[in-house]
């Protein structure tokens, strides 16, 4: 089995921070420069809807002193109400982040608009974004199934709100925050379980610990935002796949540079370390409120099976669960997950997708409404095994890593979907081959 060794300087820039940097730049008064912006399809969708609403922006590939090429985005805006009515429905493609968070901005604009997406996105639930925006005074329409198209009758007279998140959701928290910036007065978002906090950090929002253990995010309304520069670190959700590769393949040692180590994003790494994975950190520092550092990964021949059953943990590793499940199955033939029904509403039903593919590889699985378990491997398939991507980039990447770790010949359908978030996925893997 081929070992994978070397340094990775070109992991994809963080998707979550890239989305937010572009949206905040469009809301700020002045010129916003974003270095190392993501070139993935989802983040390009965000730039596309901004341009369709009249925001002036440019993006260029620049070469740094170290020879690396990165994407530099510049946005020009005059503030919160710089947007103009689009000529057609706004195409978000496959990006749920674009659709949900941009809805919060459009709710505060004095025109009507409609958000649409590809076939996958048009099936995803959008009721969760309608309730807070309607309570603030915007008109929101959905399909009879509660999905897109999302019709928005915006207004400059949004009311402030105190909104309790019914479930952990950084996207809903962010859309309420973006809408609340346009309101006349202070708004609060109450969360019982923490979710990723990039929006709070990037907007420099105050938070308050409540007596019952919950947390309030405080958003002042009607105040101008000043443009500021942003630098986008490497995406920890993308790093997850290279970490799994290094842990699973004998003889491997991989160094991942400049990765976002925000505690609300790197919880999966602590899970892996707790299971016995050989993972270390170097060069930790804080830039723009975000903790960034290098991750060192070495092959770990003996790890404990992963069992994930705490809602507070699930909320902050939801994107990494497919890879964690495949990792644990490949390493130990065991895995167990509960309290993750949210996975069924992602780009695919990720619970069923992971279970189906693992079963094709001979693993014994039990599926629950909110998770699943892997209980050993009954057989090793002979010949080529064709696995489904389910048009889901994270499913495709998770099983592409399994292809390197298992003694089976695997083929993944429609693997081009990986370009949604990780265009150079296979290039990096090939560069690490020894």
Swiss-Prot record:
It catalyses: 3-phosphoshikimate + phosphoenolpyruvate = 5-O-(1-carboxyvinyl)-3-phosphoshikimate + phosphate. InterPro entries: Enolpyruvate_Tfrase_dom, Enolpyruvate_Tfrase_sf, EPSP_synthase, EPSP_synthase_CS, RNA3'P_cycl/enolpyr_Trfase_a/b. Pfam families: EPSP_synthase. The active site is at 319 (proton acceptor). GO terms for cellular component: cytoplasm. 3-phosphoshikimate binds at residues 15-16, 20, 169, 171, 195, 319, 346. Phosphoenolpyruvate binds at residues 15, 96, 124, 171, 350, 394. Keywords: Amino-acid biosynthesis, Aromatic amino acid biosynthesis, Cytoplasm, Transferase. It is found in: Cytoplasm. Coiled coil: none annotated. HAMAP family: EPSP_synth (MF_00210). Monomer. Belongs to the EPSP synthase family. This is 3-phosphoshikimate 1-carboxyvinyltransferase. It comes from Prosthecochloris aestuarii (strain DSM 271 / SK 413). The lineage of its organism: Bacteria, Pseudomonadati, Chlorobiota, Chlorobiia, Chlorobiales. The gene is aroA.
């Amino acid at each position: 089995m081929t070992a994978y060794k070397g340094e990775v300087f070109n992991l994809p820039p963080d998707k979550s921070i890239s989305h937010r940097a572009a949206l905040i730049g469009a809301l700020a008064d002045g010129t916003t420069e974003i270095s190392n912006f993501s070139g993935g399809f989802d983040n390009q969708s965000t730039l596309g809807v901004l341009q369709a609403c009249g925001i002036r922006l440019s993006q260029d590939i620049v070469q740094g002193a170290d020879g690396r090429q990165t994407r530099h985005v510049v946005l020009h805006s005059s503030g919160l109400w710089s947007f103009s009515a689009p000529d057609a429905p706004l195409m978000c493609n496959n990006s749920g982040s674009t659709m949900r968070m941009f809805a919060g901005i459009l709710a505060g604009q004095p025109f009507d608009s409609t958000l649409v997406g590809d076939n996958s996105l048009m099936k995803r639930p959008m009721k969760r974004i309608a309730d807070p925006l309607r309570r603030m005074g915007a008109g929101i329409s959905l399909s009879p199934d509660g999905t897109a198209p999302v019709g928005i009758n915006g207004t400059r007279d949004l009311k402030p709100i105190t909104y309790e998140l019914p479930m952990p959701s950084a996207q809903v928290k962010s859309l309420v925050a973006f809408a609340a910036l346009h309101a006349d007065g202070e708004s609060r978002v109450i969360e019982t379980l923490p979710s990723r906090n990039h929006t709070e950090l990037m907007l420099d929002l105050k938070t308050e610990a409540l007596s019952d253990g919950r947390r309030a995010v405080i958003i002042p309304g009607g105040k101008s935002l000043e443009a500021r520069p942003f630098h986008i670190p490497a995406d920890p959700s993308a790093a997850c796949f290279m970490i799994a590769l290094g842990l699973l393949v004998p003889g491997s040692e991989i160094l991942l540079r400049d990765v976002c180590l925000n505690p609300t994003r790197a919880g999966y790494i602590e899970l892996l370390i707790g299971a016995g994975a050989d993972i270390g950190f170097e060069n930790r520092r804080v830039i723009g409120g975000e903790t960034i550092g290098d991750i060192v990964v070495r092959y770990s021949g003996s790890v404990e099976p992963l069992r994930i059953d705490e809602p507070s943990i699930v909320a902050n590793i939801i994107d990494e669960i497919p890879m964690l499940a495949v990792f644990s199955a490949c390493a130990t033939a065991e895995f167990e997950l509960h309290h993750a029904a949210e996975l069924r509403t992602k780009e695919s039903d990720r619970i069923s997708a992971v279970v189906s593919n693992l079963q094709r590889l001979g693993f014994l699985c039990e599926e629950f409404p909110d998770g699943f378990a892997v209980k050993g491997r009954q057989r090793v398939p002979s010949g080529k095994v064709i696995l489904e991507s389910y048009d889901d980039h994270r499913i495709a990447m998770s099983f592409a890593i399994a292809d390197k770790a298992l003694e089976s010949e695997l083929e993944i359908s429609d693997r081009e979907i990986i370009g949604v978030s990780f265009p150079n996925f296979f290039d990096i893997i090939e560069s690490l081959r020894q």
